[in-house]
């Protein structure tokens, strides 16, 4: 069955958008979920100051009426002006291991951006650099943190198949306190 992309237009749909991540990773011992109320505030134009210079829409991917993916499409006009770019960001992306689903989500963001004059796509990024960014490419068997994005190992493979290339390496380190400080 074909993938249907639905724009989130109601609070109930936004709640489904947020909760999909919890359901999707509920059996994964390494994923640390975001706090639900924090996500509601992040996606709210009334509560997130980034909406003063950003615009965004959220999309759900459905198959047979069941949510199989999600993505946020974001334009940060301040960043685009600063860097002299026309970039649409994709963020909060999650999808089942199906290239049709990931393709539909990314193509939706590209088209959304094109309709608004954007010529490039970049992500995963949030509204600003204060949001979680990047895509895990190794360390899937390590406990994530609330400050980073956790994703399944097939995500980078899907992005590569969609023609995307890594632009930077971001490294997270765990530092242990020694038992004895010399």
Could you say what each language-model-derived stretch is?
Residues 71-75, 92, 122-127, 168-170:
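Glycine-rich, histidine-containing beta strand-loop boundary motifs that form or position
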Residues 47, 74-78:
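Alpha-helical subdomain
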Residues 56-71, 160, 166-169:
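Conserved beta-hairpin
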Residues 44-60:
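A short helix-loop-beta-strand connector motif used in the catalytic cores of GNAT acetyltransferases and
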